[in-house]
A protein has these predicted regions:
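N-terminal ligand-binding/catalytic initiation module
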Residues: 1-171
Length: 171
C-alpha cells in the first residue's frame, strides 16, 4: 500500500463520522500523489503527510447564553488550529446549525492552502458554532457572541490566531 493510501486510511480511522474532512484530505492527497510517490521514503521518514492532515489543536467548548425569555441555551463552539508553519492561524468563524467538528476540520484544512497562496505569513485555522443567528434578536446574538468570545479569547491573539468572519457572522 502506498504512503498516500496509508495516510488516508489513518485519517478515516482517527476521524470517524467526519465525511467532509475525509473528502478534503482525499482530494489534496490525490493531487499530491505523483510528487509524494517520487520521494515516498523521505516524506514517510519525516511524517510529512501525517503532519499536514493532523491539526495542531482542536478546541471544543460550550457556549452558554441567555435568550430573550430568560432561558439559558447551550451551543457547541469549535476552533481548529491546523497549521502555523508560516505564521499565526487565520480563518473565519462560521455560525450555522450544521456546524460540527468534521466541517470545521474540513474548512480549516482547506484554509491552510488558501492562506499559503496569499504570500502572507499566515497559517490555517477555522472555527464556529452550531448557533443559528436566524430568527434571533440582536440581544440574543450579542449574548451568544459575548459568551463565545469569552471562551475563545484564551486561544487567540495577533501572534497566535486571528479569526475572521464567515457564514452567519454578517461578514
Amino acid at each position: 500500500m502506498s504512503y498516500v493510501d496509508e495516510v488516508f486510511d489513518l485519517v478515516v480511522a482517527k476521524n470517524p463520522a467526519q465525511p467532509e474532512f475525509h473528502q478534503a484530505v482525499k482530494e489534496v492527497l490525490e493531487s499530491l500523489r505523483v510528487v509524494i510517490e517520487a520521494n515516498e521514503e523521505k516524506y514517510r521518514k519525516d511524517a510529512l503527510l501525517e503532519r499536514l492532515v493532523t491539526p495542531e489543536r482542536q478546541i471544543l467548548f460550550r457556549v452558554p447564553w441567555v435568550d430573550d425569555k430568560g432561558q439559558v441555551q447551550v451551543n457547541n463552539g469549535f476552533r481548529v488550529q491546523f497549521n502555523s508553519a508560516i505564521g499565526p492561524y487565520k480563518g473565519g468563524l462560521r455560525l450555522h446549525p450544521s456546524v460540527n467538528l468534521g466541517i470545521i476540520k474540513f474548512l480549516g484544512f482547506e484554509q491552510i492552502f488558501k492562506n499559503s497562496l496569499t504570500g502572507l505569513p499566515i497559517g490555517g485555522g477555522k472555527g464556529g458554532s452550531d448557533f443559528d443567528p436566524k430568527g434571533k434578536s440582536d440581544r440574543e446574538i450579542m449574548a451568544f457572541c459575548q459568551s463565545f468570545i469569552t471562551e475563545l479569547y484564551k486561544y487567540i491573539g495577533a501572534d497566535t490566531d486571528v479569526p475572521a468572519g464567515d457564514i452567519g457572522t454578517g461578514a
